[in-house]
């Protein structure tokens, strides 16, 4: 009987642990008027998709000057977006003016990128706050923790699962790390996990790009209880929720910003 009880307890523990590992996913769009942002339809498409999929959450990494053109060419969609960006469905995660890679420019230039970009976004969307720095392409450099903190950011993400061809951070650590700048400033950060490998036969994509079960299992084996994947879609793509929505969301993932 004691042996049976032990087996039952073990099964309950395993089932509870498996159930407790909720998978998360960060979706969104990146691009802009000088890159890829089809002004005639994109803003209305975003608003409509958010309304159609209330469980969807997106991060916006759009060149701030884009909103000048959107306001003029599609004023109705622009007004609708203004009403949405203040909700929990949307977060601006990279307000830099031109989405620089950062590692190839000076600290002073990086500061101006944030200063000008934040001012432009606040002009169009007053009251928007900037909490988490997250990017689709590898827009990272060592001095960012200090700069981000000075602009009010609380968190950062060091993943770029779908654009590693531009560079990528080392796979390191588990669920969270403190990213420390050369001046000693730390910022709480989601890293590219040590278990987050490059996709097989790929130098431009990691396993975190679509929350496959193999990736989530690797996270579970590494002790990561709240694994997160991400993909900021090109703004030129006419695609809504990356993993599907509602009951059809891949791997039962929950969208977060």
Predicted regions located by residue number:
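Catalytic-domain carbohydrate-binding cleft regions of carbohydrate-active enzymes
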Residues: 21-257
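Hydrophobic h-region of N-terminal signal peptides that target proteins for export
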Residues: 11-19
């Amino acid at each position: 009987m004691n042996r049976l009880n032990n087996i039952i307890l073990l099964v309950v523990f395993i089932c509870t642990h498996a159930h407790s590992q909720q998978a998360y996913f960060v979706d969104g769009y990146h691009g802009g008027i000088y890159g890829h942002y089809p002004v005639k339809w994109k803003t209305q498409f975003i608003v409509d998709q958010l309304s159609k999929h209330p469980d969807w959450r997106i991060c916006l990494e759009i060149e701030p000057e884009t909103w000048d053109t959107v306001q003029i060419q599609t004023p109705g969609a622009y007004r609708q977006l203004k009403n949405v960006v203040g909700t929990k469905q949307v977060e601006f995660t990279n307000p830099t003016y031109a989405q620089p890679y950062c590692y190839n420019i000076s600290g002073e230039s990086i500061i101006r990128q944030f200063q000008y970009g934040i001012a432009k976004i606040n002009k169009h969307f007053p009251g928007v706050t900037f909490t988490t720095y997250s990017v689709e392409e590898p827009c990272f450099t060592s001095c960012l923790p200090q700069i981000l903190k000075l602009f009010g950011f609380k968190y950062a993400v060091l993943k770029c699962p779908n654009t590693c061809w531009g560079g990528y951070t080392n796979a390191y650590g588990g669920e969270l790390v403190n990213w420390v700048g050369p001046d000693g400033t730390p910022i709480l950060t989601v890293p590219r996990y040590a278990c987050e490998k490059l996709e097989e036969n790929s130098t431009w994509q990691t396993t975190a790009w679509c929350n496959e079960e193999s990736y989530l299992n690797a996270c579970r084996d590494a002790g990561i209880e709240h694994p997160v994947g991400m993909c900021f879609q090109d703004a030129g793509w006419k695609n809504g929720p990356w993993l599907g929505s509602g009951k059809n969301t891949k791997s039962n993932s929950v969208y977060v910003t």
